């Protein structure tokens, strides 16, 4: 709790209300909104999707009841692009987004446009990615696992027929095991629960949100609060039974809104 409050207070002191964030039906954006409201930040909110999208419906319901405003953008309604202009869009995506955008460089121009749009009036962009630190992201039981079994459960789930003869599956996953050992500074082949929890921020989050955050910093200052060490290290020790089904996460949002109700539904 204190780590979150202090972090967002620093944001308030540096950027006041010139801060933008998405709001959706997920835990993470709603938790950021709750913390921001607690420290006095009036977020400039946006949501992407169609009118029938659950994210849009939930976001609009939240802002209505909280007396806030939100910028709703349906990316699918962008005008159809002619062949002549499409070259420029692909080229812009290639250079602006380092060809690392989530949906690829072949889009309708909405990716770059919305990144610019959401930061026109703000100095800082916040992304709730990483909020899974408060949930059982790996969906594994509360026990030790060998690194091999961990990889098998979460990563070795592909159809390798798409690979050429140059791909050596055995070698690839042996290297993956060694990489996990290096990340966790261990020589053991078995991981305890805390080590498994660490792999979310130190492995998965690093190569997911790290890329997106780097791209966002081309358009404005951008932060991913739940990826910060002072956030995720404290989350490692939350009992796994509370992380299941979003029990802790839901109560944490309520706690930020109505301080004092944390754990009320966690018996």
Residues of each region from the PLM?
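ATP-dependent adenylate-handling active sites, centered on carboxylate activation for C-N bond formation
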Residues: 1-191, 213-262
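The feature marks non-catalytic terminal segments
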Residues: 194-199, 222
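Core structural elements
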Residues: 197-211
């Amino acid at each position: 709790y204190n780590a979150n409050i202090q972090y967002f207070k620093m944001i308030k002191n540096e950027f006041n209300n010139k801060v933008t964030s998405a709001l959706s039906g997920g835990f993470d954006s709603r938790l950021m909104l709750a913390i921001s409201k607690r420290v006095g930040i009036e977020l400039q909110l946006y949501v992407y999707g169609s009118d029938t999208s659950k994210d849009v419906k939930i976001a609009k319901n939240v802002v209505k009841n909280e007396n806030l405003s939100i910028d709703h953008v349906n990316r699918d309604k962008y005008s159809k692009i002619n062949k002549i202009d499409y070259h420029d869009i692909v080229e812009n995506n290639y250079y602006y987004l380092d060809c690392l955008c989530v949906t690829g460089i072949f889009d309708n121009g909405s990716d770059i446009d919305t990144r610019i749009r959401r930061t026109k009036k703000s100095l800082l962009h916040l992304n709730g990615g990483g909020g899974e630190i408060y949930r059982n992201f790996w969906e594994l039981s509360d026990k030790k696992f060998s690194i091999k079994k961990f990889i098998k459960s979460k990563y070795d789930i592909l159809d390798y027929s798409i690979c050429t003869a140059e791909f050596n599956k055995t070698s690839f996953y042996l290297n993956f095991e060694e990489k996990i050992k290096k990340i966790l500074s261990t020589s053991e082949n078995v991981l305890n629960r805390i080590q498994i929890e660490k792999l979310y921020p130190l492995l998965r989050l690093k190569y997911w949100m790290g890329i997106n955050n780097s791209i966002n910093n081309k358009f404005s200052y951008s932060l991913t609060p739940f990826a910060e060490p002072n956030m995720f290290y404290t989350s490692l020790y939350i009992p796994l039974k509370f992380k299941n089904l979003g029990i802790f996460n839901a109560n944490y949002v309520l706690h930020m809104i109505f301080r004092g109700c944390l754990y009320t539904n966690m018996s």
